[in-house]
From Swiss-Prot:
The lineage of its organism: Eukaryota, Metazoa, Chordata, Craniata, Vertebrata. The modification Phosphoserine is found at residues 47, 688. The active site is at residues 186, 226, 386. This is Proprotein convertase subtilisin/kexin type 9. The gene is PCSK9. Residues 1-30 form the signal peptide. Cleavage by furin and PCSK5 generates a truncated inactive protein that is unable to induce LDLR degradation. Undergoes autocatalytic cleavage in the endoplasmic reticulum to release the propeptide from the N-terminus and the cleavage of the propeptide is strictly required for its maturation and activation. The cleaved propeptide however remains associated with the catalytic domain through non-covalent interactions, preventing potential substrates from accessing its active site. As a result, it is secreted from cells as a propeptide-containing, enzymatically inactive protein. It comes from Pan troglodytes. The C-terminal domain (CRD) is essential for the LDLR-binding and degrading activities.
Amino acid sequence: MGTVSSRRSWWPLPLLLLLLLLLGPAGARAQEDEDGDYEELVLALRSEEDGLAEAPEHGTTATFHRCAKDPWRLPGTYVVVLKEETHLSQSERTARRLQAQAARRGYLTKILHVFHGLLPGFLVKMSGDLLELALKLPHVDYIEEDSSVFAQSIPWNLERITPPRYRADEYQPPDGGSLVEVYLLDTSIQSDHREIEGRVMVTDFENVPEEDGTRFHRQASKCDSHGTHLAGVVSGRDAGVAKGASMRSLRVLNCQGKGTVSGTLIGLEFIRKSQLVQPVGPLVVLLPLAGGYSRVLNAACQRLARAGVVLVTAAGNFRDDACLYSPASAPEVITVGATNAQDQPVTLGTLGTNFGRCVDLFAPGEDIIGASSDCSTCFVSQSGTSQAAAHVAGIAAMMLSAEPELTLAELRQRLIHFSAKDVINEAWFPEDQRVLTPNLVAALPPSTHGAGWQLFCRTVWSAHSGPTRMATAVARCAPDEELLSCSSFSRSGKRRGERMEAQGGKLVCRAHNAFGGEGVYAIARCCLLPQANCSIHTAPPAEAGMGTRVHCHQQGHVLTGCSSHWEVEDLGTHKPPMLRPRGQPNQCVGHREASIHASCCRAPGLECKVKEHGIPAPQEQVTVACEEGWTLTGCSALPGTSHVLGAYAVDNTCVVRSRDVSTAGSTSEEAVAAVAICCRSRHLAQASQELQ
C-alpha cells in the first residue's frame, strides 16, 4: 500500500458513515443483530491502514476452531491467538489492522480485550464473515470461537478422604493449608457466611455473560449458591477440607452458573498478573466448570501450570469422555471425577460423572454438605464433579503447605499414590472406557514424612489412534517426569508394537497400528527419578534363525523397560519382547522380525529386578505385581502370540490382556506370562530410614 497523497480530498465523517452502510448493509445489519450496543465504529481510513501494513508471514497457516457442542457455541465473539513470541504492541497493532480492514469492507468490530501476560492475542466481537480475513493477518496462530462453560454441580465426604487407619474426628492432618492461597473461578460468594468469613477475599474481577431470558430474577442467594458452597468445601471452618487455606474468588459464572471460555481466559490472565505483581507462596486454582473442548483454554492452563500454579478442575457431569471437554482435557490440569459414599461413580439423573483417560482421580461428589447462601449460618447438600474437584483442591493445599517446594508433577504423583485403589465398580463405565479410567479415589496422606523418598510412577494413556494401516498413537509424560517404559494395547490385537523416541527434546511413547487393526493406544510409564540419566538402546531385526537382543551396556545403568515394533507388516500379529530374567537381567530378547528397544537408566542408588508370572493355559488376563517398597516401571508379555491384546500398568501391577480364549482358537502352547520390571532407590530408602 502506498502513502496517502497530499492532494487527496477527505469526505466528511457523516457522509463516510452513510457510504459505509450503503456499501455493506448485510454485514452491518448482521453485526447489529448480535449486539446493538457497539461503543466504537472503525472506518477504513486509508492513512491508518497504510501505517499498520506489515509483511505477511509465509509458510504458516492459521486455523479456526469452534466448540463441537452446537448449543454451547457463541458465534460472533472470537479469541484471536497470536504466535508465542508476539509482543503486546504487535497484538494491539494486529487488532487495529483487523478493525481497519473490516470497516473498509463495511463491517463493525469491537475489541473486547487484549491478552498479555498469559498468552498473546485479543478478544473481538465481529461477524463470522471476517474470519477468512482475520486468519490471514500477520502473527495469527489460530482463532477460536467463544463458547459457554458451566458450573458442574447438580459429612461422609470428610470421612471418605481420611486415611484408613484413622477416624475423621481423631485424624490430625499434616497441615491445614495455611501457606497456600486458593483461587476460585465461579459465581459470586456470600463472604459473610460463618463457614468462610475471614477466609475468602472477593476480588473485583467479574466477567460474566447476561443471564438467559428477560424475566430472570437475580436473587442474591441463587447467584452466590455454587461459589459459596465450594468455598466452604475447600476451607470451611466445620465442613472444609483445608481449614487453614485462604481463598480469593473471581466471578466468571453468572447467576445461572453459566460463563464463557473468554471470560475464563481473562480470569486466568488476572491470576497470572497478580502472581507477577505480588508473588506469594504456592497457588492452587480451582476451576469447577466445564465447556466443550477448547484449544485456547487448554493452552492458557498449560501456560499457568508451567508458571508454577496448580490447577484443579471438574471432569464434568455429562457421563461422557472427559477428553471432550475443557479444561478437563488439559494434560497440565488435575482433573477430578465424582464418587458417592459407596465409592461408586456419581449418577445425576440420566447423566453423571465424566470418565476416561483424561481423569486423574475421583473424589467425593454426591450429597456434599457445605455452606449455603440462603443465610450466614445455613448449610446445604450439593452434588457434582465441582464438589469433587473442591475436595482435591483442599487436599492439594494441605500437601503444598506441608511441602511448598513440590512441583505439579510431584503433587500429582502423590495424589495418585495416596489414593484408595481399586474400590470403584468399573461396570458403571462404558466397556471401552474401563481400562482407561483410573480406579482411584482421593485421600489425604497419612503423613508427608518420608513421602519424598519414594519412587513414584503413574500410567499415561494416549488418545486412540485411527484405524488406518500406518496410524500411530503417542503418550507423553509431564516435563518433570522420566519416561521409563512404553507399551501398547489394541482391542483387536492387531498392532505393530511400540517404541520410545525423542520428540522436541523429550522421550515419548509411540504405538503403531497394523493392517486390519481398529486402532491402538500408547501407554507411557512416567516416573519421578531425580538426577536420572536415561537412554534408549535399540537392536534392529536379527538374521533368520536368530533372536534379537539388546541390553544396557553402560556402566551403572539398569533396565527399566522393554518394547518392540515391526517396520513391516506381520498380519497384525505383534510378538512383544521376551525378558530373560535369569543370567542377564539387563537384557531384552525378542523375535527376529522385530526391532527391540531397552530403556536403561542410571540414578543414585537405583536398582531393578524382573518379576514374571505365567499361567500354563491361556487366560484373558494375567497379572504380576511388585512387592511393597518396589515400584513398577516396566510391563510386557511373554511370549508374544497373536492373541495378546497388549500390556499395561495399573498402579503397581502389570496386566497382560489376551483375546477371549473361547473364540480365539488357542492351543496349550500359547500360554501367556506377565513380566514386570520393579525398581527402587536404595539411596532414597536409606535417606528415609535416617530421618525416621
